[in-house]
Amino acid sequence: SLVEETLGDSCDIETVKNIHEKMNEIAQEHKEDPEPVVLDKNEVKTIFASSGVANDRMEVFDQCFDATAGEATSLMMTNVYNPRSFEVKTPDVVIKVNPERTDLVNTKLIDGRQCLVIELDGNIEVNGITVRAAGSGDREESEE
């Protein structure tokens, strides 16, 4: 994908989340438009730069955009991001997040291990069973 190719080894969840959130804002601004949202190279470049993409990776952006867009000078926004889902996958876990609530997902170093942290808000279900979040009497994880 354009995002993955542009970011290369510096592709991290925070940057991808920032790009998704900015794309989602644009999608919301145009949700009444009958035509799909189209972004030119400069618009996508601005979104990437303001989402925290490093300057050295922005130098790669032009060739990645041209390879993705081909002869076109613009891309449909859905070629850059999926407005219907925000999914985090590891080999053992798949987490689907409301694409408008990516703010609930963060990464954090806990006890020396990189962890995905999801803010729990409202009802929680595990396999269709309503459960409660750990209470305030439980031990909180230490941060390093």
Model-derived features: where do they sit?
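Long, hydrophobic alpha/beta structural blocks
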Residues: 1-84
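C-terminal, beta-strand-rich globular interaction domains
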Residues: 52-53, 57, 66-67, 72-144
